[in-house]
UniProtKB/Swiss-Prot annotation:
GO BP annotations, alphabetical order: proton motive force-driven plasma membrane ATP synthesis
Organism: Pyrobaculum islandicum (strain DSM 4184 / JCM 9189 / GEO3)
Topology class, membrane: Peripheral membrane protein
Full protein name: A-type ATP synthase subunit A
InterPro entries: ATP-synt_VA_C, ATP-synth_a_Xtn, ATP_synth_asu-like_sf, ATPase_F1/V1/A1_a/bsu_N, ATPase_F1/V1/A1_a/bsu_N_sf, ATPase_F1/V1/A1_a/bsu_nucl-bd, ATPase_F1/V1_b/a_C, P-loop_NTPase
NCBIfam families: PRK04192.1
Pfam family, one: ATP-synt_ab_N
A GO term from the CC aspect: plasma membrane
Top-level taxonomy: Archaea, Thermoproteota, Thermoprotei, Thermoproteales, Thermoproteaceae
Assigned EC number: 7.1.2.2
Catalytic activity entry: ATP + H2O + 4 H(+)(in) = ADP + phosphate + 5 H(+)(out)
Amino acid sequence: MSGKIEYISGPVVKADLPGARLYELVFVGEIKLFGEVVRVQGDKAFIQVYEDTTGLKPGEPVVRTGEPLSAWLGPTIMGKIYDGVQRPLKNIEEISKSPFIARGVGYDQAPPLDLKAEFDFKPNVKPGEEVYPGDVLGSVKETELITHYILYPPLPEYVPGTVEWIADGKYKVDDVIARIKTKRGVIEVKMWHKWPVRRPRPFREKLPPVEPLITGVRTIDTMFPIAKGGTAAIPGPFGSGKTVAIRTLSMYAQSRIIIPVLCGERGNEAADALQGLLKLKDPNTGRPLLERTTIIVNTSNMPVAAREASVYMGTTIGEYFRDQGYDVLVLADSTSRWAEAMREVALRIGEMPSEEGYPAYLPTRLAEFYERAGRVVLMGSKERIGSLTIAASVSPPGGDFTEPVTSNTLRFIGAFWPLSPRLAYSRHYPAIDWLLAFSRYVDTVEVWWSKNISPDWRKIRDTLQSILVKEAELQEIVRILGTEALSEYEKHILNVAYMIREGFLKQDAYNPVDTPSSPIKQYLLMKAIYAYYEEGLKAIEAGIPASVLRELETVKRLPRLRMEITNDVAKEELTKFIEMLISEIRTTISKRQ
C-alpha cells in the first residue's frame, strides 16, 4: 500500500505506486501531505498534492489510503470554515500556532466533524419499519436555524432492510443510532458518513426548475431570473462587483442552506468576504447567517491543486443538504481560478494543451460541475423534493468574455449575469449588463409570478426590456446628432429607459430599504414605470412634449421610490402612487385639450 517519490514538479509528484487507482487519496512524503492520484501509467502514479511540496525529496514514501478524497457529512458541519480538503481552519490555526496553515495536518489532528459532540436524536422511523437508502432515520437540532436530518446513506454497502433497533436520546456524532437488518446482515448506522467528492449523489428523478429563487436583487429576479435548482454565472473583470454580488446572494437568497466556496481568490479579499459573512444576520430571524452556512476557503496563496478539491467539496456538501429536503445555494468565487489550477496540473503531467493552455477536458469538467445542480425527487421510500442551485463567478482576464472558461461556461448555464466595468465605474450597481445578460428560466418561472404576484408580470417585464434595447439603439443617434434629432416618442423612450435604470435596475446593496426587494415591491416598481410609459404615449399623441411629462412631480419621484418605500408597505404605497401618477398625466392631457 505504499511506494516512493520519483520526481517533484511544483504541485505534481510522480511516484512508483503499484496498485494506485485514479482519484485515490494518498499521503506524500515523511510529513504526510494530502495528495490525489490524477493519472496512472502502469505502476507509476501522478499525484496532485494539496499542500506545499517544498522540501520533498525523491525516495520519500507515498502511502495509499485505498479510498477516494471524500467529504465527511454529518452534524457539526454547519457554521464551519474549511480549507479545500475539509480541514477546519480554526483547528489548523490552533495546531499551527500561526496565521499560515502548517503542512501535514491530517484528519486525525483536525477532523472535519466534531465526532464527540452530543445531540438529542429524535427518530423518524420505528423498529420493524422498512427503510431504503436515502430515507430519513431521524433528526437532531444542529443550530437554531437548521434541523439536521440523519439519512440512511445511499452508498452501495447500504441496502434496503428493516429497522431492528432505533431509540431517541443523547448520542455522540460517532455513536450508532440505528441497526438495520438486511439480506447482507445487520448494518449499524451512525450520524455521519463519508461521500467521494467527485461522485454526484444519486436521486430518483430530475424535475423542471419552475420556482424562482428569490434573491432580493431586482435585475436578477425580474429581468434575468434563476430558478431553484438552476445554474448561473457571474463573469466580470476586477472591480466590477463580483464579491458584493456573491455577498448579497448569500445574505438574501431564499435558500435554507448557503455554501460559499472562495476558490483561489486573493487572501485579503477572502478575509474581507469572511469578515462580512461572519457579521451577517439572517434577515428573517436575526440569528447569525453562519448558523445556516458552511464556508470553503482556498485562497490564492494556498496550493494550486486544492482549488479543484474545494469546488467539488462545496458541491458535495450542498448535495448532502439537498438530500435532506432543503433548498441549497452553492456560490463559487471563482471558477476561473479553478480552471487555472487544472491548467497548471495538466501541463505538469504532460497532457496536450488546448486553447490558451487549458486542458482539452475543461468543458467536460465545467459540465460535470454545473450538472450537479437541479431540483430533484430524492432517494428513499417517501417522495421528498430538494434543490441545489449553483451560482459561480468567472474572472476573465481583462473582461474578455471570449476566453475559454467564460465561453465554455455559457454552454452549461441557465442564467448569465455579466458585469460591466462601464456600469461599475459609473456607480451603477449591480453592474449587470442588461444587453448581454440572459436567462433561460423566464418561461418556466412565469407561471409562479403570474399565480403569486400578477398575470401581467411577463408582459410588463418584456416591455421594459424592449425599451432598454431601443434606448441602446437611440444612444447611437444621440452621440452623433444630439437629442434634437429625435422625435417626441423617441425622447419619451429615453426618459422611460432612464427611469428603468435609475428607479429599478440600480440597487444599493448596503441600503436596508433598497435591498432586499420583495417580489411584490419589484412588480409594483416595474408597474409604476410601465404606467409612466403607457400614459406618456397617450400624452405625446395629444401633443404634450416628453420634457413636460418628465417635469411632473410624480414622475420626478419615480427614481427615488426604491429607497423611500419599504417592503412591508410596498403594496399599499406603490398602488396609491401608481394611481396618482396616472391621474397627474391624465390631468395634464385634459388641460392641453
